[in-house]
């Protein structure tokens, strides 16, 4: 019997597998596709040409994870992205932005002297908020959804963990000081009004708005898009704070390095295997059933699939509390 079966060999699943294996757990990772990585893969779409087919840049990978998994030892290399963006204009001018602040100001001054002066202040505001909030990324979030007492036992250890998390969040908010209003707007609001307040040139606002809506079908006027502006200055996987980078060999090289690290820690990884159901007996995880009909016994399951797949397709309806199932059904990924 396994201590944990992880559904999906995406980069999050591989990190989870490594962490559990380092604690002495017997871990099995099951991946539906024939290659690991999930959305972090390199594939040969045309003969002789390999590309990152989903995720294409790295920055938010935590340095702690990189060090613990010894990813460089397993072939992980990052090439800093410079320039970071190129925006052509309709009048023959263009905007080229990169990691050098003075060069950015020179570029922006083509379109607005005021915007060139504002840009360092805008970056500093994002930096301060990001630095205060980044420690929260390493904290286990508390359970905010009310659940029946019969579904999960809440012991002293969990209460202590939630209290500790709340304390760290309080400390982060305290350090925000007078930028708390801006932080709240960045975490919950749309990007467009923020950019409109800071800048006047459309080409700069359009370039920065890309950071807010990348990978979504939302306009920059949609609530929640402002948060992604913070990603522009968060992370340091590119070699310095806020620097994004390309992985040598494509994003799949990162997943391959993670898989190699996980295997070195004792993790078993099987590809080309689809999980059809998470088996539950007496309100406890008992195993998983594969598409082949085979069942694998395990004490726990960690799913790298999304919430809809995990709770609506892999677990029979009615197994979980109705309030939880309704909350999952309302999740909108668009």
Predicted regions and their residues:
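A conserved short coil-to-beta-strand element within the FAD-binding core of flavoproteins
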Residues: 268-286
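Active-site/ligand-binding neighborhood in enzyme catalytic cores
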Residues: 127-265
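Flexible loop/turn segments at secondary-structure boundaries
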Residues: 35-39, 214-217, 277-279, 308-312
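Conserved acidic residues
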Residues: 3, 286, 299
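General beta-strand structural signal in soluble alpha/beta enzymes
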Residues: 29-31, 206-208, 271, 298, ...
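Glycine-rich loop(s) and the adjacent beta-strand/alpha-helix scaffold that form part
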Residues: 244-260, 264-265, 278-279, 289-334
């Amino acid at each position: 019997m396994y201590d944990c079966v992880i559904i999906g060999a995406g980069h999050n699943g591989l990190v989870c597998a490594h962490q559990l294996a380092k604690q002495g757990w017997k871990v099995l990772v099951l991946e539906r596709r024939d290659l690991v990585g999930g959305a972090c893969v390199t594939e040969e779409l045309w003969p002789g040409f390999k590309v990152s087919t989903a995720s294409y840049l790295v920055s938010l990978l935590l340095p702690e994870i990189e060090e613990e998994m010894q990813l460089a030892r397993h072939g992980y290399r990052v090439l800093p992205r410079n320039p970071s963006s190129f925006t052509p204009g309709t009048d023959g001018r263009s905007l080229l932005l990169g990691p050098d602040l003075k060069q950015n100001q020179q570029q922006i001054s083509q379109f607005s002297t005021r915007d060139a002066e504002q840009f360092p202040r805008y970056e500093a505001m994002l930096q301060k908020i990001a630095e205060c909030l980044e420690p929260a990324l390493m904290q286990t979030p508390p359970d905010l959804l009310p659940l029946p007492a019969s579904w999960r036992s809440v012991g002293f250890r969990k209460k202590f963990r939630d209290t500790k998390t709340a304390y760290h969040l309080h400390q982060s908010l305290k350090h925000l000081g007078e930028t708390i209003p801006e932080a709240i707007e960045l975490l919950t609001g749309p990007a467009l009004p923020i950019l409109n307040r800071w800048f006047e040139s459309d080409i700069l606002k359009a370039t920065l708005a890309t950071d807010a809506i990348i990978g979504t079908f939302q306009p920059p006027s949609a609530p929640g898009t402002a948060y992604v502006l913070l990603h522009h200055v968060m992370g340091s996987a590119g070699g310095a704070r806020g620097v994004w980078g390309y992985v040598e060999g494509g994003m799949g090289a990162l997943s391959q390095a993670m898989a190699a690290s996980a295997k070195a820690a004792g993790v078993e990884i099987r590809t080309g295997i689809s999980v059809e159901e998470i088996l539950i007996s007496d309100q406890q995880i008992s195993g998983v059933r594969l598409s082949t009909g085979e069942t694998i016994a395990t004490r726990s399951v960690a799913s790298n699939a999304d919430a809809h797949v995990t709770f609506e397709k892999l677990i029979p309806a009615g197994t979980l509390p109705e309030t939880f199932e309704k909350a999952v059904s309302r999740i909108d990924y668009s």
